[in-house]
């Protein structure tokens, strides 16, 4: 075979996926990369060898990709006690929420996230790991996503005059979770119209004191 033909191709996407190698390589193959930083490939052109049908050259057409939307951090709500924590905002959504509840409210909370290359990220455990009661709220991700959180906080026995979270309730684009903790009227709502929740931050000690959210615009791509 004429050495001046393309013997293999591999494709990469913006989501970090790499295709299998199509064709085969040889020990003396010359590698090339078609890429333009910040652009997507929207078409191809090239040359082929008449008679054999082999492709001898390949080029690409590029178009600038829109910048990904920036996340926004909404202020945490709750009491002033506890140490600050922040799971970050480098996620595409929330898959599961683990809520530890006790007789006086929310003892702990932990979140399971997914990022833009479909990796599952387990967030840190915030609050008392020695749970008295453990509940889970599963989302049907990616079709289901969080849109708001309702909660209430108050001073309870053992909180040393620091207000702690006593109730949380989560709403998605499809449904509303049960009320976790005490059955109390909400004193705050974490929500931004047209956005989904992709991360959490707050303050905790042996209880959850404060909770805030990171949000991204809802897209339907």
Curated annotation (Swiss-Prot):
A single MF term (Gene Ontology): carbohydrate binding
Superkingdom, taxonomy of origin: Eukaryota
Keyword Repeat annotated: yes
All copies of domain Jacalin-type lectin, residue ranges: 1-64, 71-217
Keywords: Lectin, Repeat
InterPro entries tied to this protein: Jacalin-like_lectin_dom, Jacalin-like_lectin_dom_plant, Jacalin-like_lectin_dom_sf
Claim: Repeat is one of the keywords in the record: yes
Family per similarity comment: Belongs to the jacalin lectin family.
PANTHER family noted in UniProt: JACALIN-RELATED LECTIN 22-RELATED (PTHR47293:SF58), JACALIN-RELATED LECTIN 3 (PTHR47293)
UniProt name for this protein: Jacalin-related lectin 47
Provenance organism: Arabidopsis thaliana
